[in-house]
């Protein structure tokens, strides 16, 4: 029993991370309810989970809402752009799913749409984590997300699998898993992409720390 309660044990560390991810998932869900704030809440979520991946988390709630406030405007702008593009692709997909086999034109158009959807998915995976760790323009974030996603394709596929498996588990296997949901996915993806973030920018948190120092 003493071993189970030892905070240095791997089992305790795993259970702690799971508990944290469930709590962060609740914060993310609540802050995403207005829909328009999904970008800011997702950026805040990744800000915290990337800190967790570095074992530098200190006060989950405080860090979450700090990142939420600081990134609200750029994250909302980024989210609205991605939402508009995603809605356009979804609407086109709904139409083409009924017409793709009618002739070669619709088949080629459907193939083009699928390719665009894949590229969109790649950008979506990296956009908010990058915004959580780097200061950049909206176009810069989108461009970097695409380039990073294509260059580190294996990590991209793993991250996509994390979200896909979680979605499958929630829908078909164990619905209460939604309590972990986005929080768990963000935490796993943060561990997967942390090394990449260092490779593309040295210390990606330096900008945030400089701002904190200036404020003090």
Residue map of PLM features:
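Helix-coil boundary and N-terminal low-complexity module in membrane systems
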Residues: 1-100, 104-109, 113, 120-216
């Amino acid at each position: 029993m003493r071993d189970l309660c030892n905070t240095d044990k791997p089992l305790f560390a795993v259970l702690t991370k799971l508990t944290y991810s469930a709590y962060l998932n609740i914060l993310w869900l609540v802050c995403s309810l207005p829909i328009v704030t999904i970008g800011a809440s997702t950026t805040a979520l990744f800000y915290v989970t990337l800190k967790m991946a570095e074992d530098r988390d200190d006060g989950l709630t405080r860090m979450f809402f700090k990142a939420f406030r600081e990134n609200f405007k750029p994250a909302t702008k980024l989210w609205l752009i991605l939402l508009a593009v995603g809605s356009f692709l979804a609407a086109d997909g709904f139409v083409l799913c009924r017409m793709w086999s009618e002739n070669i034109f619709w088949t080629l158009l459907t193939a083009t749409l699928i390719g665009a959807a894949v590229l969109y998915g790649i950008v979506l995976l990296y956009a908010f984590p990058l915004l959580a760790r780097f200061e950049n323009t909206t176009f810069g974030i989108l461009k970097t997300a695409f380039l990073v996603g294509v260059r580190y394709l294996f990590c991209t596929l793993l991250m996509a699998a994390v979200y896909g498996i979680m979605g499958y588990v929630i829908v078909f296997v164990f619905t209460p898993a939604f309590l972990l949901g986005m929080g768990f996915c963000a935490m796993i993806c943060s561990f997967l992409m942390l090394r990449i973030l260092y490779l593309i920018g040295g210390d990606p948190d330096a900008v945030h720390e400089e701002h904190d120092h200036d404020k003090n």
